[in-house]
């Protein structure tokens, strides 16, 4: 049997303790079923295929929690399916007349109901008590899900890609539920320390940028009013830009979407003014304090029982990359960044355990080598493996130093425009254009690859490693899109291979995945072996896709994140 289903509960996953109703639709007969919960669960447990929207992260774990349900059949989550197939849906939504603004780019059932003409009626309820309207609402959700499943099915999408995304979604849900152990006490102490330093800097800046006193006169009586006093606010980008312009004639080179001067710690760090250094530190401290304590995604605000349970959307980008939120663990500063080491030390493991950090070596470079091998029989791969890729780039691009070559190379690899390359290597625009042209002329295999990829991109998509369609917005970003997607798909295969292998280790659990890196909590005695297995699984993932390059990785063992990456 094959069923589409939906449930209504009295709360979210961790708070609900009651399932009000379960509705099933037999997709072979079209029959809608509204049995009692026990009967419905038995049918789902015995089904060959169960289909639902966001069932991996909600419906199934709810039924497992409240009814100890076990499902033997295949699980198909339409949320996972739509995120894979319609990764560029936001662009299309903008072209639909009167499309609800709160649904643009969303993959909710409400949004999909609007797209496929099966509009969801909303009901007023606190979800605490069952009502007949609630059952009708559940039936409606089941119908929307069924029609959405048919839309997905008609696409005839790559089964390999679809299966991979479902496997990754399931293992990442386990990661989220387990959480990353967080040192709350240490985080609070760090926040206090940074706030104290911020107060010192604020006081110093008040002395540098004196209050602006403006005389005021009544327009009615002509009498003098109390002077207006504007106290300098070092956290205000508008105030900072205004004062720098007044004192030094500074003009912004970059602007925000609403036309205001763009100003952050990276821009301030490049200015020659003595106040810029203090302002730069002030901006940076504000950013770190927001990450730790004050911001909407602050770690301390999302800590639960000594752990951070960050959410991961496993396919949020057209390139198949994941995104992170509540809080964003993809933006924890690196150990080389200011206060980065102190921040990473907050993410740790329980006493007696170890953290194993593993990442793929030179991921984007290896993906480039794989695709270039078609045109140069592995010559560039040989340089990457046996020589020094940045020294080679220095020679090919005619740059002055290896450091410049490295900056140019990664900017080029990540899709940087000539303007961006010029900024990164500190060269005039025209010279940067010549350097890029020289690099491509001296590397004909890369030139041919770019031409081939741009030609393929004219149909609107590229074919990924697992036969998925990678949407391309424009030809100049096609190579970067291809390489990013290849890296993302490869890492997803790696996660699946690795998580299968560590099932035999008691208390071993992946706690975070960020791009080409994973962190694994485990017993101290198993740490080294798990690290070796993780690296072996990187190699295995490359072989799975028949890559023309050998892949590897490296691992580190510590008691916190600062020691493993």
Report the location of each language-model feature.
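Conserved "right-hand" nucleotidyltransferase catalytic core of DNA-directed polymerases
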Residues: 1-8, 16, 21, 99, ...
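Active-site-proximal helix-loop-helix substrate-binding element of RNase H-like nuclease domains
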Residues: 13, 17-20, 24-35, 48-154, ...
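Metal-dependent catalytic core segments for phosphate chemistry
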Residues: 18-21, 364-397, 466
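Short active-site oxyanion
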Residues: 45-50, 71, 228-231, 352-356
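Short, conserved secondary-structure transition motifs
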Residues: 80-90, 234-235, 554-565
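Conserved catalytic core of nucleic-acid polymerases
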Residues: 227, 309, 314-317, 395-513, ...
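Short, contiguous acidic/charged loop-to-helix segments that flank catalytic cores in large enzymes
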Residues: 295-303, 314, 333-335, 357, ...
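Short amphipathic alpha-helices in soluble, non-transmembrane regions
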Residues: 530-538
């Amino acid at each position: 049997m094959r069923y589409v289903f939906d449930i209504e509960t009295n709360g979210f996953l961790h708070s609900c303790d009651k399932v009000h109703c379960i509705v099933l639709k037999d997709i072979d007969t079209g029959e809608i079923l509204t049995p009692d919960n026990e009967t419905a669960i038995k049918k789902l447990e015995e089904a060959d295929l169960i289909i639902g929207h966001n069932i991996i992260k909600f419906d199934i774990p709810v039924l497992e929690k409240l009814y100890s349900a076990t499902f033997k059949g295949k699980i198909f989550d339409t949320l996972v399916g739509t995120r894979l197939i319609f990764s560029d849906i936001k662009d299309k939504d903008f072209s639909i007349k009167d499309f609800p603004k709160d649904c643009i780019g969303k993959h909710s059932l409400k949004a999909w109901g609007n797209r496929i003409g099966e509009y969801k009626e909303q009901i007023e309820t606190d979800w605490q008590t069952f009502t007949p309207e609630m059952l009708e609402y559940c039936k409606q959700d089941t119908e929307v899900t069924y029609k959405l499943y048919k839309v997905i099915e008609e696409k005839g999408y790559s089964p390999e890609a679809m299966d991979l995304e479902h496997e990754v979604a399931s293992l990442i849900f386990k990661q989220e539920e387990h959480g990353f152990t967080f040192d709350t006490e240490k985080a609070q102490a760090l926040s206090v320390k940074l706030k104290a330093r911020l107060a010192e800097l604020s006081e110093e800046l008040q002395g540098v940028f004196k209050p602006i006193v403006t005389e005021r006169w009544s327009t009615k009586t002509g009498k003098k009013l109390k002077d207006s006093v504007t106290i300098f606010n070092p956290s205000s980008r508008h105030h900072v830009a205004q004062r720098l312009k007044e004192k030094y004639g500074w003009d912004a080179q970059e602007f925000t979407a609403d036309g205001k001067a763009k100003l952050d710690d990276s821009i301030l760090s490049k200015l020659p003014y003595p106040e810029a250094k203090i302002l730069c530190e002030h901006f940076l401290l504000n950013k770190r304090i927001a990450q730790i304590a004050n911001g909407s995604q602050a770690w301390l605000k999302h800590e639960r029982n000594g752990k951070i349970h960050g959410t991961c959307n496993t396919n949020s980008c057209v390139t198949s990359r994941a995104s992170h939120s509540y809080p964003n663990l993809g933006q924890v500063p690196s150990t080389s960044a200011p206060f980065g080491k102190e921040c990473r030390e907050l993410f740790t493991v329980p006493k007696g355990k170890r953290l194993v950090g593993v990442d793929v070596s030179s991921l984007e470079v290896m993906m480039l080598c794989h695709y270039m091998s078609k045109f140069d029989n592995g010559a560039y791969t040989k340089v990457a493996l046996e020589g020094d890729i940045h020294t080679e780039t220095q020679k090919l691009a005619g740059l002055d130093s290896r450091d410049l070559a490295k900056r140019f190379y990664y900017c080029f690899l990540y899709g940087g425009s000539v303007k961006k390359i010029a900024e990164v290597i500190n060269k005039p625009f025209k010279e940067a254009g010549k350097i890029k042209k020289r690099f491509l002329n001296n590397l004909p295999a890369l030139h041919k690859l770019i031409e081939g990829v741009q030609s393929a991109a004219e149909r609107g998509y590229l074919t990924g490693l697992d036969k998925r369609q990678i949407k391309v917005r424009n030809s100049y970003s096609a190579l970067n899109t291809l390489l990013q997607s290849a890296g993302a798909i490869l890492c997803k295969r790696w996660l699946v291979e690795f998580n299968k292998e560590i099932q035999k280790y008691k208390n071993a659990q992946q706690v975070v995945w960020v791009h080409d890196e994973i962190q694994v909590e485990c017993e101290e005695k198993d740490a080294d072996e798990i690290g070796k297995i993780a690296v072996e699984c990187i190699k295995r993932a490359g072989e799975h896709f028949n890559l023309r390059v050998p892949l590897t990785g490296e691992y580190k063992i510590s008691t916190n994140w600062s020691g493993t990456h």
